[in-house]
């Protein structure tokens, strides 16, 4: 194939089309209906490589142009191309692992030579490599509300801190209600609590931070045992930090978008959040609210059961779920909101609110997905299960499938998912690598892309595989801000023609190798005939078809 491309000077997107079609043409079943598939009496759709070799040997520019046009035209039918890739993957080389490692190394060379690594290392860096995988499926917002006792702040039983957050523990028997965190009449009392915690605990026992206390969380005493576990405290308090950012943006231009993203509330001011959090709900013949129920009821040993389920709250706000179901979920101490909705027969109508995708693509911000599988133990989704125009994404720890309408939308959804959950360390045979390849394979093979979109996919692939390798100074690139990440990945410079061709070859082969690994091998292609041990002359015994 390279000889054909070099001889006839086929470059850029035309070369990429020829290479991809050449890999899968043997799997195409052509009807020859229009007879435009024949080149020198051979069906070029089914025998593309052979026709390219003949055209090269004959030096036929006319046939070469016809073959290139045929490849470009064939790639417009992406569903057929995807099906052929799946069929082609049933036959696996015995050296598939070595081939994958070779392609990863080639991609790394382009990563270096194109200046992409240098570009990445020019971004903000940090010392810590660890991070918490986060999305907006659960929240600690209810614990910012202030516990009351007979019209006064409830007495505090214990004090603690985490970073710049003060933590007050309360005996539930001394709490008869909760009021908004921005109540003007209690501002002085809360400031007094901040000063008290800062004086008693000048250094955070979790993080070692010694700065000012910026906010106070109000937790029941029963949560102390959960917060005593470092991992639980980190997970919960990172979400509390996200909630505090939401609170401090009240009155800003960004706040309506945050309201829409986190609570599916549209065109509202900051006061509406208290209607959602403190609004009366009827449960077991009692009036309660999301904040009150969360504070007065225990979770399990899993930290998620102590949060409020934001995804269920958005679903209820969109009218697809009874609000009381939110309390049922918390009462049962469940952890997966998608599994809960599947049990309620919402298998393929699970809503996702994504204002970032809407902002970048100009489309709707509400998407309806179908449940795929719970992601226990780094489970890798199988790309063979995707149907037309679909991509994978996750809601908390559950894979779902979303239908996209444009290539840009598919790239954006995939980029958001990879930014949330994938941090590549340069190792290719790890669960995280296979998860990233499951997401990227669909982009590389299925969607029709131009050079700008392929450049974005290349940077996204480099991030997913190499993005968390330390720099020469031992620091790590900070990828935590989604807006900055999308700007750096989607809006970078276009690859040159040579870079585009080189990285496309490696990404295409990596994608096909991943598809091969996604299914039990049907047949292994041997590099040379395998000699069977000789056992002497075997006499063939005749069989009688009608024998009883």
From Swiss-Prot:
InterPro entries associated with the record: Orbi_NS1 (IPR002630)
Family membership: Belongs to the orbivirus non-structural protein NS1 family.
Name of the protein described by the UniProt record: Non-structural protein NS1
């Amino acid at each position: 194939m390279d000889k054909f491309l070099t001889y006839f000077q086929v470059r850029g997107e035309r070369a990429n089309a020829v290479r991809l079609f050449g890999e899968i043409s043997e799997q195409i079943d052509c009807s020859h209906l229009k007879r435009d598939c024949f080149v020198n009496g051979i069906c070029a759709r089914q025998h593309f490589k052979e026709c390219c070799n003949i055209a090269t040997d004959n030096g036929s520019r006319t046939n070469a142009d016809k073959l290139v046009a045929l490849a470009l035209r064939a790639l417009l039918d992406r569903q057929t191309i995807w099906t052929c890739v799946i069929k082609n993957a049933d036959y696996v080389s015995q050296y598939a692992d070595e081939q994958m490692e070779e392609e990863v190394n080639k991609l790394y060379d382009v990563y270096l030579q194109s200046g992409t690594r240098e570009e990445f290392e020019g971004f903000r860096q940090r010392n810590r490599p660890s991070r918490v995988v986060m999305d907006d499926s659960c929240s600690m917002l209810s614990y910012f509300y202030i516990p009351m006792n007979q019209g006064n702040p409830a007495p505090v039983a214990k004090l603690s801190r985490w970073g710049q957050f003060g933590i007050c523990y309360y005996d539930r028997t001394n709490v008869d209600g909760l009021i908004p965190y921005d109540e003007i009449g209690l501002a002085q009392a809360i400031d007094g609590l901040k000063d008290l915690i800062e004086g008693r605990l000048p250094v955070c026992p979790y993080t070692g931070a010694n700065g000012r206390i910026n906010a106070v969380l109000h937790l029941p005493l029963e949560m102390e045992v959960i917060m005593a576990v470092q991992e639980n405290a980190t997970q919960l308090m990172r979400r509390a930090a996200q909630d505090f950012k939401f609170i401090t943006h009240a009155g800003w231009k960004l706040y309506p978008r945050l309201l829409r993203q986190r609570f599916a509330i549209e065109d509202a001011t900051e006061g509406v959040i208290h209607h959602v959090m403190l609004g009366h709900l009827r449960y077991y013949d009692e009036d309660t609210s999301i904040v009150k129920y969360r504070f007065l009821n225990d979770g399990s040993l899993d930290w998620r059961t102590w949060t409020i389920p934001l995804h269920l709250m958005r679903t209820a706000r969109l009218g697809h779920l009874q609000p009381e179901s939110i309390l049922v979920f918390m009462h049962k101490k469940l952890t997966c909101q998608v599994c809960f909705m599947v049990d309620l027969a919402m298998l393929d109508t699970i809503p996702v609110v994504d204002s970032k995708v809407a902002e970048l693509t100009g489309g709707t911000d509400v998407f309806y997905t179908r449940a795929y599988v719970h992601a226990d133990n780094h489970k890798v989704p199988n790309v063979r299960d995707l149907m037309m125009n679909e991509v994978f994404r996750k809601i908390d720890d559950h894979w779902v499938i979303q239908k996209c309408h444009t290539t840009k939308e598919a790239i954006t959804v995939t980029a958001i998912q990879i930014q949330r959950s994938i941090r590549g360390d340069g190792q290719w045979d790890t669960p995280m690598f296979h998860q990233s390849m499951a997401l990227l394979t669909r982009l590389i093979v299925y969607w029709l892309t131009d050079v700008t979109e392929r450049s974005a996919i290349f940077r996204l692939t480099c991030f997913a595989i190499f993005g968390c390798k330390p720099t020469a100074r031992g620091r790590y690139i900070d990828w935590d801000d989604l807006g900055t990440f999308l700007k750096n990945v989607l809006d970078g410079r276009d690859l040159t023609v040579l870079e585009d061709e080189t990285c496309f070859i490696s990404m295409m082969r990596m994608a096909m190798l991943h598809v091969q690994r996604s299914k039990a091998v049907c047949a292994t292609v041997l590099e040379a005939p395998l000699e069977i041990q000789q056992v002497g002359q075997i006499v063939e015994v005749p069989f009688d078809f009608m024998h009883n």
